Amino acid sequence: MKLISIIFFSSLASFAHAQVSLDEARSLVGNSSVMVLDIREPEEHATGVAKGMKLIPMSTLESRLNELPKNPNSRVLLICNTQNRSSAVAKELRSRGFTNVEYVRGGMSEWAKRGWTMESPAKP
């Protein structure tokens, strides 16, 4: 819950964090050397997800940090609906020692606007 509070209050923080274009993120989905992490909530995932992205809702991220790469230098891309939450989570993960975290500009709302393939999330 602490992580959620920190992220909520810093969600409008500076966007000076490392960011990546939607096109680049799309090209990296499925690349085994990059984790592309969709941090939207389950009700947002229900609208469609991109195949190959790991789904960890922001509300559960703190309890699921063990699912992130063990190497803190591994590349992690974060995507949410627009980029507000993903930029805040990137900042928080960097403060926890992850050195190669970027957020995706535009988010999944822009992904959908471009008509890129989305599918129903896997059943838990």
What name fits each language-model region?
Residues 8-9, 13:
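Hydrophobic helical h-region of N-terminal Sec-dependent signal peptides
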Residues 37:
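Active-site flanking residues adjacent to catalytic metal/cofactor-binding acidic residues
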Residues 2-4, 15-34, 42-75, 84-124:
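Rhodanese-like catalytic fold shared by cysteine-dependent sulfurtransferases
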Residues 78-80:
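Metallo-beta-lactamase
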